[in-house]
Amino acid sequence: MARREPIAFDAEVQRFFQFLVDSYGMAGPEYSELLLPGVLYERPELRVWVFLQAGDGAGTQIDVDVCLPNRDWPAKAELRDLVEAAVFAPRHRVAHKAHTPDAARKTLDENATWLRRLMPLLLGPDVEALMRKANERQVDCAGNPKKRGPDVKWKFD
């Protein structure tokens, strides 16, 4: 059996997220390992971070965070919450697994697809409302997430 080489995280992120530079004029990629391996893309009104989180109980995973800089409130949301807030799909449909090189590439590819779909909203006039909705956590009295109503019509489900 052939030995599998680990992925070069920054190179793989660049391969899948290059559309941010080509189509949206974002600066980057800028690689950092301050706390977690991460790749940053940015423009004055928007930042996108792609992180590799290793060693937690869920195994290695990839997270994509979107931030609106220069706001007087914490304008940051995870990709999976933005996908649900935009009524594209339930948050659990956004991939995050990276336990193998193939799983990491699949997750990066799917995350890039979700971000492509979100970019018009993230650069649109209602971006702050979308970010606030993505950060709303409706929970029951025990702290569990409340179920969505049965009438939700997902755009990409």
Identify the residue ranges that each predicted region occupies.
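Intrinsically disordered, low-complexity regulatory regions enriched in serine/threonine/proline
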Residues: 1-16, 28-157
